[in-house]
């Protein structure tokens, strides 16, 4: 943000708030940022692929027969070049996923609620985007103060998970209602499958 603020002064660009400062396209600073950003996004994708491969390898030890039907790569908090309204622009999706026509995605709930496999409807007014999940309705600190282990055990009844106070801030009650999120996204996506939690893996 410091470099962007300096560029605003250099280019005599006036903004209502310094936090809105940006890197003008065509500058060396912009090109460098895009280079490292795309590298990081590629790195993240390869990490997801590696995690999936390891998960499937471990699954073979406990489930004798299974068939991988489809692999969905749905990332959020990313930027890419797209064409919207006959203009090539950079679209940043923060807390959102790409939901162009028939784009496959996943909208997860919390560690104890349902998740949804979806297909995009290509809503132009949303720049072909949809929510990426339920999202928090309270901070981790507030959740730790408000909920107890008894609350967590009740919310996670019927789901296998690691019982630890460390996970209290991930309790379903700290998140928005994912079913309501799906309902409010009906112009952006269509639901293909509804997934029910049976096992939760969460690190410290």
Residue map of PLM features:
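Domain-length cofactor-binding catalytic modules of enzymes
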Residues: 1-204
């Amino acid at each position: 943000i410091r470099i962007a603020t300096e560029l605003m002064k250099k280019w005599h660009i006036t903004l209502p708030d310094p936090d809105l400062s940006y890197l003008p396209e065509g500058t060396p600073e912009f090109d460098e940022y895009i280079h490292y950003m795309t590298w990081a996004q590629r790195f993240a994708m390869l990490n997801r692929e590696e995690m999936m491969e390891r998960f499937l390898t471990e699954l073979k030890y406990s489930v004798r027969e299974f068939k991988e039907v489809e692999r969905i790569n749905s990332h959020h908090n990313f930027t890419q070049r797209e064409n919207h309204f006959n203009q090539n622009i950079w679209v940043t999706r923060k807390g959102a996923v790409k939901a162009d026509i028939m784009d496959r995605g996943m909208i997860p709930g919390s560690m104890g609620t349902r998740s949804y496999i979806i297909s995009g409807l290509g809503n132009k007014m949303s720049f072909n985007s949809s929510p990426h999940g339920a999202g928090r309705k309270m901070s981790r600190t507030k959740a730790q103060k408000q909920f107890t282990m008894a609350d967590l055990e009740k919310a996670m009844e019927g789901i296998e998970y690691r019982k630890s106070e460390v996970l209290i801030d991930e309790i379903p009650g700290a998140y928005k209602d994912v079913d309501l999120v799906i309902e409010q996204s009906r112009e952006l996506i269509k639901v293909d499958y509804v997934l029910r939690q049976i096992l939760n893996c969460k690190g410290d």
